[in-house]
């Protein structure tokens, strides 16, 4: 055993490679061992340090792989299971327990997180060199009994399936101890690099090999000062020192301090000595010179986006200086927080990168396919699950148009549940092509219908049916087409996912082939395996920027290192125990255990592990290290890491980067895609601010560069503007939609739509777009239902009582096909019908026969011509006649409405005046009767606040007051209206005033007609206060944003409340007089 150590300013890998090279020249076989997380980088570093850059005598590997080299040809080798296979074994074991058998974990038998914890505990017991029996020191005996029972069943299942129930390292250790490998090991030298501690399993192997290998050489980082110190707690080198001292005691050998030929820059050495002095309590410090300050810099940025962009531009500048991507390493404080942002910005700057981390499969279409399939079975064919399956792009053959059409029908008909999906669609024949839909339904659902009917049977039979189902829906062919047009790197990702998927199927066949399972269990097992699976990619080329977590970095890893997100939350990383065994229980087990096995207690290792990680990070670069921190991390403020505070205190430069500085040098632009992105950002921001001379110079250089690039690609720069100008509809379309020889057809609702937003009129009445419809009743259907009840009620001139007539009207309406189908679909619809019946009965109290009023007609259609160029169509719900012969118009409303002269003036309430104009100009009536008014009737069941009601008599009175006609009434008919149920306050108009209203109403139609016929429709939703937009905006279509486009909104003309009525009447009269002139 040889123990070597050197300080952080020298290269331990170079030292150990020299040892390996000399041993190889002497004829020994060398195994160079690196940690799992560093094996790829360590292999490259070892090869670069070898004089010949390669050697057949030197094998760079890991402990687990080392075991395979020596035991591959050993007899009685059993099949190993990966984590997914182990999870399946535990799932099967837990399923064998009856309810109540597991006292602590009984409710977690099917919980995926619990199964994952069991798998982690199983592997940790192997690594710790412990058996399940040694958990008897747990605080809870019931917990130990449950875990023991579970693990015993797992052991039986592994033995029955002839699976390997021990790790490769444990098997290798047994073989070494037995002496079977002595011949192979006697010519072997083992070199161990990159460790600061061994697991119990690795330590047992080292002990076994120490007496059988020719030599074992272990290297670690520690300074002579730290190694000779009596007290090492808190020392920056404490991890390496404690490791070396433990090995020295265990193997009775003295560590040797050695120096490499390569030495880091003096600046890094000076900083390292300052940091060491702060942590060994000697307070020795060295003033940083300019060389040291050039080595390490701290950047403070505003947020993560700015932070990554600064680094991306710095990388581009390194390329201009002649360096390669492979010379640059990017480290992340929190990979999950930065991965998406970094990927997006690096692609903008054309920086190829490689994430040194296993990637999850959760976002892959194949995972969505399995998840949707599992949900379909579990939740009995919810519409969203079925559609999600079809939308994966790898299910069946269907065009996007057919899929959209199918989805529209599913939403309309509210198709859910297997019965509705597996039977022909019959609802909505007037709106949809049911023949086309049923053809689509059969092609998509026939394979699924057959598969979901799978009964409980042996796993192998279910798997075969599943494979047949995948063939029917063309899964592999669809996946091939999906990835066919992708880049080579993306294709490799899909291949890795497919390989993982097939491995899961093989594991299932092996483990559950003879086990009886129902389809839910089958899909749940496969889906959980897919969701938890990960895969690793090998970089397509060596010349890429490597990206990984900072705690995986080794000293002197690359020329330039950028460490992002070095905030207090992530630097240092505080390891937390989330396993089934607490730290206290781990300590109890370790104290009671007299074997070589022991649990690692990470919380006890946090300090020295984090100190060494910080030291490694500060020496990760050979030329320059940049540490960056954002002021906002994940949209919340975070503090600077205490390690960075130490650097700042000893004089390391601290730069506030702020927003990207704009300099006139061409290399500061970055690259074409990045510049284009910045132009887009500028377009989206406020650009009316004053620019500094430096910013003006930058953009003048940038625009010249951008114009050259765009010209070479044949692209023109569009005018950047906030305008929402629309294109005039072609004359051909306008002629087809509005023939010149025909009058323009309008209605009061169409006019309201036009003045709400001209573009809304274009969408609704020119393009003919409709809102998503449904078989379930909504406000439109509710209003139609109540209209029909009152129509039948008022036509009934029989001798029955009013209540009998009302009940008869309700019953007849309920039996009409259209309403019967609408309100009998489900419990929700039936409940809506009960509410509507209550509303009808409550509103009908106002319709009782009144001696002063009779119903003249109902559902009266009318056509009103204006200058022979505009035809206004409509239906009047009811026309009443008073005792003096005057007529009035009633319009039923399902919500509260009243006549607002301000809204009327602005074109938003033309309905009542239009109805008055219609009946006053009726050609079929020779002698025109007077008009007493036009009004709304709110169909409602009045509700009162009982806390404000003093006695029950007041309750009845207030209910009757709520049921009144509201609108505009003729002042001449006041005496006939006073005793009726009419709201007359501020609602009486003289004949002259009504004439003014009618004239203005016609003017509104004429102005709208002129605009409509011009084909130019503005995006101008109305606003009442010039601060908020009240009209319909259609943001997804128009791109209208209130904060940017308020100037485009149509501001309503408003007057003070006291002046509103007379003021608007005066305005209308003046406008009419001006038009006459």
Curated annotation (Swiss-Prot):
Its cofactor is Mg(2+). GO terms for biological process: double-strand break repair via homologous recombination. It is an enzyme of class 3 (hydrolase). One of its GO terms (molecular function) is 5'-3' exonuclease activity. Its EC number is 3.1.-.-. Pfam families: ADDB_N, PDDEXK_1. The keyword Nucleotide-binding applies. The keyword Nucleotide-binding applies. Keywords: ATP-binding, DNA damage, DNA repair, DNA-binding, Exonuclease, Helicase, Hydrolase, Nuclease, Nucleotide-binding. InterPro entries: ADDB_N, DNA_helicase_suRexB, P-loop_NTPase, PDDEXK-like_dom_sf, PDDEXK_AddAB-type, Restrct_endonuc-II-like. Transmembrane segments: none annotated. SUPFAM superfamilies: P-loop containing nucleoside triphosphate hydrolases (SSF52540), Restriction endonuclease-like (SSF52980). Despite having helicase-like domains, this subunit does not have helicase activity. The heterodimer acts as both an ATP-dependent DNA helicase and an ATP-dependent, dual-direction single-stranded exonuclease. Recognizes the chi site generating a DNA molecule suitable for the initiation of homologous recombination. This subunit has 5' -> 3' nuclease activity but not helicase activity. Belongs to the helicase family. AddB/RexB type 2 subfamily. Heterodimer of AddA and RexB. This is ATP-dependent helicase/deoxyribonuclease subunit B. It comes from Streptococcus agalactiae serotype V (strain ATCC BAA-611 / 2603 V/R).
